[in-house]
């Protein structure tokens, strides 16, 4: 949400309750009751301490040595943002300068440094997912890490793996990698590894169930919608990518705005304490989304570690649920000292684990202004001023990776008569504003809150300013010697058509975050539906009525309906270029004119009609009471539901053509680890965690320092009368039902980052030889799907679990691809035993290999043979 959304919310939250010591907030008093659908989130206390895994041992040892000597003020400082507009970044914590810990800078976005300059605007997550290329996923993460580090950013607010794409109209689906748990998991994990290899803390988000933008937030008049998710669906679909992100060592998790099973994500003890920190072994820190904290004591007890941007119910008032109120809650005993110590230790341990105690730059940019100088704290009156932007160029040669991703993501859906690739001297007529520039200027719309010119990304906090943009119009004009351009969304009546002319029609479909409404779409695609914007369907039909050869180029945030024109005889080819970022033009012409064969594959299903989806995944509108978004479709999202309902889509998940052809041969399956039991072996025990004195600190530790120069509305940890706060310790805080300070037994499904380490034992390895049988060079993707036996109960008939992409193969050459399948990959979540259940020795499991979910080329049966289909 970030800065603009905070301003937009001020009016709607004006009558909200402000923070108060030891009190519940706007909505938290209601969160323990069951909702109308019967879903509830059982309590799980206390919050587990971090530091019990050997992979984080060194970082926690360093953090312990520092935290044990911190004052209460220093500890609180690191848990609470300084307030919106109270520093250079979209969020910053207070500091602990005695120990060398500065204000930690937190900044968007998953595709580039937001509200900055001289940075790369990479392709969006959905584009990266369409590459089905793990190396490019990792490379983008590395270069994002380099750029964020170069700007002095400690915490990158990405990647996004939630929403997962359950709702095809969902506004922020494009920030993630595709509508499948494994595709999201692999894309997220590779990105995290890349980012953190550069010493920047990655943040996996939004945890969890934020599948719709409208009504995601609570305010005084309306609770956020509740995503009602059963235990098995939660584990097998929505938690899957988070578990893999945690296994990759992610340093931070961001909670979602919405509720899950009637409890706000930022204070849902089941989600944070039990699942995230205990079962999945998360060792980093949990932060809120911006203004997504709804209570003070309640959120601390439930496992929240950092409040962002720090403000309470209404931003810019200088009030907070934490900050000085957290100091008060420690002094009066409402929040145990041990909980605060763990909160701070988690934050400091992540800082050490990324090596940020070394030569790490301070922020050298401002997300508040593009001017060189200005207020240091724009949210305050009479702020001191200084240099706020140093215009550090962090782009290096990252345009190469950006172009490669955008190019390798381009997905060829149709290519009748092999009309593509085009020849440089073909007579081209290019139509559509999506081919050209934004007439108002490159970055004229804040947070890309408009659809003008070529669509490079959606809108909202997940965006970045474009340092430059090569449009398709520019790139085509640079290559083609015979192209005419009609940058309009209305087909010109006076276009002359000659024999052999090719019409290239550009259309788009946009979406974004809820705080901006674009052309009647408040984030989600409410007005446009799944159709092209700006009369795109009509533009294609008009061109097809006049030209005998039409190529359609689609820039889209997700599934888009094509039925009005896809079967017209003149429509020869369709390319989906997704959201390509700054290299939109060059990446397209690389493929359009045949320098590269297209190798992208759909990261979602394209339906024939929106009615192909069940009503449960439609957008929900405002009722009189809280919206109940119940996941009645369960495990069956996207291609899974099409398979179950026996609905043939227009184009299936994973579909993507090439200018050449490929064969799959010599499939083999080998056993790596014998699965001798239904459930994994007993988890390893937890190791020791840091220990600290538990006595309540002296109140003087949060007294205002003498001669301290206060910044108005800046959030400090200090109290005017700390001694008085300590005296109120006799009052009993109304703790949530089920609250206890007695630790729970360790969940049997846990034991390491991501869960029981035995879950990630490689059970099988599958190899297949891919041969280029065509006449042009190209790359192929082998997609691996599992089919589980009936003995495990009802499961989707095919589930993507792995994929691999060849290098560029010359005609007649081959490459053998090998993919590994873990115990977890062939397991289901047992809701009774609360553990992952797999067939012994994998009996009955089938492993399918193909180029889409409906284009299978080979199959292996565990315990049987492999064969080519």
UniProtKB/Swiss-Prot annotation:
Enzyme class (EC, first level): hydrolase
Biased composition (Pro residues): 681-691
Location, primary (coarse class): secreted
Naturally occurring in which organism (per UniProt): Aspergillus fumigatus (strain ATCC MYA-4609 / CBS 101355 / FGSC A1100 / Af293)
Source organism, top-level taxon: Eukaryota
Residues annotated as signal peptide: 1-19
Family named by the database record: Belongs to the glycosyl hydrolase 3 family.
Localization per Swiss-Prot or TrEMBL: Secreted
Record's keyword terms, sorted: Carbohydrate metabolism, Cellulose degradation, Glycoprotein, Glycosidase, Hydrolase, Polysaccharide degradation, Secreted, Signal
Catalytic activity: Hydrolysis of terminal, non-reducing beta-D-glucosyl residues with release of beta-D-glucose
Region annotation Disordered: where it falls in the sequence: 677-697
Biological pathway: Glycan metabolism; cellulose degradation
EC number: 3.2.1.21
The UniProt record lists the keyword Cell inner membrane: no
Glycosylated residue positions: 77, 261, 332, 364, 399, 478, 728
Record-level GO cellular component terms: extracellular region
Biological-process GO terms, alphabetical: cellulose catabolic process; glucan catabolic process
Protein known as: Probable beta-glucosidase F
Function: Beta-glucosidases are one of a number of cellulolytic enzymes involved in the degradation of cellulosic biomass. Catalyzes the last step releasing glucose from the inhibitory cellobiose.
Gene3D superfamilies in alphabetical order: Glycoside hydrolase family 3 C-terminal domain, Glycoside hydrolase, family 3, N-terminal domain, Immunoglobulins
PANTHER family: BETA-GLUCOSIDASE (PTHR42715), BETA-GLUCOSIDASE F-RELATED (PTHR42715:SF2)
Name of the coding gene: bglF
């Amino acid at each position: 949400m970030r800065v603009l959304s905070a301003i937009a919310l001020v009016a709607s939250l004006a009558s909200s309750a402000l923070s108060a010591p030891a009190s519940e907030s706007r909505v938290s008093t209601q969160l323990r009751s069951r909702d109308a659908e019967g879903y509830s989130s059982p309590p799980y206390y206390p919050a587990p301490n971090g530091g019990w895994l050997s992979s984080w041992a060194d970082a926690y040892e360093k953090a312990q040595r520092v935290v044990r000597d911190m004052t209460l003020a220093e500890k609180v400082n690191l848990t609470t943002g300084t307030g919106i507009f109270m520093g250079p970044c979209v969020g910053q914590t207070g500091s602990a300068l005695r120990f060398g810990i500065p204000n930690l800078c937190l900044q968007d976005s998953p595709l580039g440094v937001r509200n900055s300059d001289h940075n790369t605007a990479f392709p969006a997550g959905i584009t990266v997912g369409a590459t089905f290329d793990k190396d490019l996923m990792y490379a983008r993460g590395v270069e994002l890490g380099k750029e964020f580090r170069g700007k002095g950013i400690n915490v990158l607010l990405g990647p996004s793996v939630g929403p997962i794409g359950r709702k095809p109209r969902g506004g922020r689906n494009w920030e993630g990698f595709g509508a499948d748990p494994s595709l999201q998991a692999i894309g997220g994990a590779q990105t995290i590894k890349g980012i953190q290899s550069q010493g920047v803390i990655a943040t996996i988000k939004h945890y969890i169930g934020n599948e719709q933008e409208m009504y995601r937030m609570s305010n005084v008049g309306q609770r956020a919608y509740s995503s009602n998710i059963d235990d098995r669906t939660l584990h097998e679909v929505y938690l899957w990518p988070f578990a893999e992100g945690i296994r990759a060592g992610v340093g931070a998790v961001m909670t979602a705005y919405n509720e899950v099973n009637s409890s706000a994500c930022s204070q849902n003890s089941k989600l944070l304490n039990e699942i995230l920190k205990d079962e999945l072994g998360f060792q980093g820190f949990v932060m809120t989304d911006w203004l997504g904290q709804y209570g003070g004591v309640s959120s601390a007890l439930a496992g929240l570690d950092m409040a962002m941007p720090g403000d309470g119910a209404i931003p810019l008032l200088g009030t907070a649920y934490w900050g000085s109120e957290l100091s008060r809650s420690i002094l009066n005993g409402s929040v145990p000292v041990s909980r605060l110590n763990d909160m701070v230790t988690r934050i400091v341990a992540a800082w050490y684990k990324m090596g940020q105690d070394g030569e790490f730059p301070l922020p050298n940019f401002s997300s508040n202004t593009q001017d060189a100088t200005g207020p240091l704290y724009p949210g305050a009156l009479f702020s001191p001023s200084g240099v706020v932007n140093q215009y550090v160029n962090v782009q290096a040669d990252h345009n190469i990776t950006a172009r490669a991703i955008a190019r390798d993501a381009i997905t060829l859906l149709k290519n009748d008569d092999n009309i593509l690739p085009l020849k440089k001297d073909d007579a081209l007529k290019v139509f559509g504003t999506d081919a050209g520039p934004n007439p108002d200027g490159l970055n004229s719309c804040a947070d890309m809150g408009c659809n003008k010119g070529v669509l490079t990304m959606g809108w909202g906090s997940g965006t970045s300013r474009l340092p430059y943009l090569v449009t398709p119009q520019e790139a085509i004009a640079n290559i083609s010697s015979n192209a005419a351009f009609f940058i309009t969304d209305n087909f010109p009546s006076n276009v002359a058509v000659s024999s052999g002319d090719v019409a290239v029609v550009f259309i788009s479909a946009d979406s974004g975050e809820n705080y901006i409404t674009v052309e009647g779409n408040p984030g989600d695609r409410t007005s446009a539906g799944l159709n092209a914007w700006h009369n795109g369907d009509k533009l294609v039909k008009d061109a097809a009525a006049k030209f005998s050869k039409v190529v359609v180029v689609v820039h889209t945030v997700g599934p888009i309906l094509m039925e009005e024109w896809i079967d017209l005889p003149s429509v020869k080819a369709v390319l989906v270029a997704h959201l390509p970022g700054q290299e939109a033009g060059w990446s397209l012409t690389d493929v359009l004119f045949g320098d590269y064969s297209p190798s992208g594959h759909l990261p979602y299903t394209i339906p024939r009609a929106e009615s192909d989806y069940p009503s449960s995944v439609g957008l929900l509108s405002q009722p009189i009471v809280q919206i109940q978004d119940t996941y009645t479709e369960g495990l069956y999202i996207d291609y899974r539901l099409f398979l179950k309902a026996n609905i043939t889509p227009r184009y299936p998940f994973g579909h993507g053509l090439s200018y050449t052809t490929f064969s799959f041969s010599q499939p083999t399956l080998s056993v790596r680890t014998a699965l001798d039991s239904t459930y994994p072996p007993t988890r390893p025990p937890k190791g020791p965690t840091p220990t600290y004195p538990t006595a309540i600190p002296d109140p003087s530790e949060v007294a205002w320092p003498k001669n301290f120069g206060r910044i108005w509305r800046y959030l400090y940890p200090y109290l005017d009368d700390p001694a008085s706060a300590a005296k109120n310790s006799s009052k009993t805080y109304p703790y949530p039902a089920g609250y206890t300070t007695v630790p729970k037994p360790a969940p049997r499904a846990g034991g390491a980052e991501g869960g029981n380490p035995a879950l990630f034992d490689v059970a099988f390895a599958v190899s297949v030889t891919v041969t280029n049988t065509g006449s042009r060079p190209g790359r192929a993707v082998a997609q691996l799907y599992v089919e589980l036996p009936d003995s495990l109960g009802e499961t989707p008939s095919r589930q993507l679990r792995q994929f691999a992409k060849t290098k560029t193969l010359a005609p007649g050459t081959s490459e053998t691809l090998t993919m590994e399948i873990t115990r977890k990959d062939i397991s289901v979540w047992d809701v009774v035993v609360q553990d992952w259940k797999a067939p012994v020795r994998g009996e009955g499991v089938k492993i399918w290999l193909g180029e889409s979910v409906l284009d299978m080329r080979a199959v292996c049966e565990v315990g049987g043979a492999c064969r080519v289909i």
